[in-house]
C-alpha cells in the first residue's frame, strides 16, 4: 500500500459529511437489471443498501480502510477484479483509497447533481463509491473513494485459485507488456523470459542467444471480464506476426513470435487465430508451443513505458481480424 503525505486532509475531512449525505440521498434508488450471464452473490441487507441502492458506510468503519495486505480487491457482488493492492494508499479520508483501477474494471457515472462522479463495477454495475480528481495526493492525481463493504480481498497467495495466466512473446517485451497491460480484465502484465533451459536467466544471457530463452510477457487476467481468445487476438494485433526472429528494428532469435499454451483449449484458440490470419493473406510465423517455466525479468524491464512516459517503438496496434489485408 502506498504512503502519502496528505496536505489536503483538512479539506477532505470537511467534505466527509457532504459526501456521505450525497451518497445516502441515493438510498432506495435501485438502478439497472441483473445480467443473465453473471453469477450474483447473495448480499446481506447492509451490503444491498450500499451496493445495489447506492448507500454508503460510515467513515472509518470499513474493514479495508487501513488494510495493507498484498493482493487483489474484487467486487463483493460479482467477484470481478477491481483494484490492485499496489494502487491503494492512505488518504486519511475514512474509506479505502486507490489511485488507479484494473483496466476496464470500473466505470464512471455523473451523479444527478453533476458535482460528483460515481464509480461502479463495470461487470455488474454494483455501486463502489466516488472518484475525485485534482487533489494531488499521488502522481496520478486520482482518488477512488470506495466502500469497504463493496469489496472482497484475495490474498496474493491465493491469486491463481481465482484468476488465469497466459504467456505471449512478440518482440521486445516492453511493448507487448505496455499494450496487454492496458487491456480490459488484465490484472498484471510481467516482462520476462521463457522457452530456454537456463534457470533464472539475465537479460544479457538472453541477448547472447546462449540461454535458449526469448523475451515474453506473462499476463494475469480475470476470466469474469475477458477471455483467453480476446487476449490472444489483442496479441496478434499489437505486433507483426509475419516477421521471423525480429520485431521492427529489434533483430534476433530472442524476439521471435510465440504463444505458450497451458492446455488444449488455449492451443486450439491460438491455432484457430493463426488460421484466420493466414486466411486473410498473412503469412503467420507465430509458434504455438506448450508453456514452460516463465522467469520474471529484472526490475528495470518492468512497466518500462509507464515509468518513462515513452511510447513503444516497434509495436503498433493494427486491426488484423476485422479488416482485410491490403
Predicted features along the sequence, with ranges:
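Bacterial N-terminal signal peptides that target proteins for export
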Residues: 2-15
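Hydrophobic helical h-region of N-terminal Sec-dependent signal peptides
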Residues: 13-24
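Flexible coil/turn and secondary-structure edge motifs
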Residues: 23-326
